[in-house]
Design a protein with these regions (language model features):
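N-terminal targeting leaders
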Residues: 2-194
Length: 194
C-alpha cells in the first residue's frame, strides 16, 4: 500500500514565505513614493542599479587580466559614482582597473583609491568592519547629519564616505567620522546637492 504523507510544516513554510514576499513588495512599493518625493535621495531602483554595477565592475576587472587573481578589490557604487579600493599587485593593474571601470555604461565617475601591495590581512579587514560600524552608527546618531544618506566603506584604516549630500552635510560627516578612534584617514567621495 502506497500512502503519501503530507508534511504540514512545508505548507507553513510556504505560507510564511509568501507572507514575507508580500510584505517586502508592499514595503518597496510604499518606499517608492517616499524616495521619489525627495530628489536628494536615491530611489530603490538606483540602489539596485548600484548593487548590480558593483558586481559588474568587479567581474569585468577580474576578467580583464589574470593578475587580479590575488588582488583584494573593494567596489562601491553610489548613484553611479564608483569607488575602487583595495590592493593590487602593480601600478599597471591599478590603472587598468580604472580604465575598465570607466568603460562601463552606467559608471558616471570613478574614484580610484586602489593601492599597490599585497592584500590586507583578516585582522585588518576585521578592524575595517569595526571602524565602518562605528562611523556609521555615529553618523546615524548625530542629529545634524543625515546618516542614512551616507554610505561608509573602510579599507586598510581609510574611511571612505559616499553619498548625495550638501557641502555642509559632507563637512559635518567628516567631523563626526574624525572622532572615531583608529582610523587613519577620511576620503570624501560625495556628490553634492548644492
Amino acid at each position: 500500500m502506497n500512502v503519501k504523507m503530507r508534511a504540514p510544516h512545508n505548507e507553513a513554510y510556504a505560507y510564511v514565505n509568501r507572507t514575507i514576499l508580500s510584505l517586502t513588495i508592499l514595503t518597496l512599493l510604499t518606499g517608492c513614493g517616499t524616495f521619489g518625493s525627495n530628489s536628494n535621495q536615491r530611489t530603490p531602483g538606483v540602489i539596485i542599479d548600484d548593487t548590480v554595477l558593483e558586481n559588474l565592475v568587479e567581474n569585468e576587472i577580474r576578467k580583464s587580466d589574470p593578475g587580479y587573481k590575488g588582488s583584494h578589490l573593494v567596489i562601491v557604487s553610489y548613484n553611479g559614482l564608483v569607488l575602487l579600493a583595495g590592493q593590487v599587485a602593480s601600478e599597471e593593474l591599478r590603472q587598468k582597473a580604472n580604465t575598465v571601470t570607466q568603460g562601463l555604461r552606467r559608471v558616471r565617475k570613478v574614484h580610484n583609491e586602489l593601492t599597490v601591495g599585497g592584500p590586507t590581512s583578516i585582522m585588518a579587514r576585521t578592524n575595517d568592519a569595526w571602524l565602518t560600524s562605528k562611523v556609521k552608527s555615529r553618523l546615524i546618531a548625530n542629529k545634524e547629519v543625515k546618516g542614512t544618506r551616507i554610505k561608509v566603506q573602510t579599507e586598510n584604516g581609510t574611511v571612505f564616505l559616499l553619498g548625495l549630500v550638501s557641502r555642509a552635510q559632507a563637512d559635518k560627516a567628516v567631523e563626526v567620522a574624525s572622532n572615531v578612534y583608529g582610523l587613519q584617514k577620511i576620503v570624501k567621495v560625495f556628490e553634492y546637492t548644492d
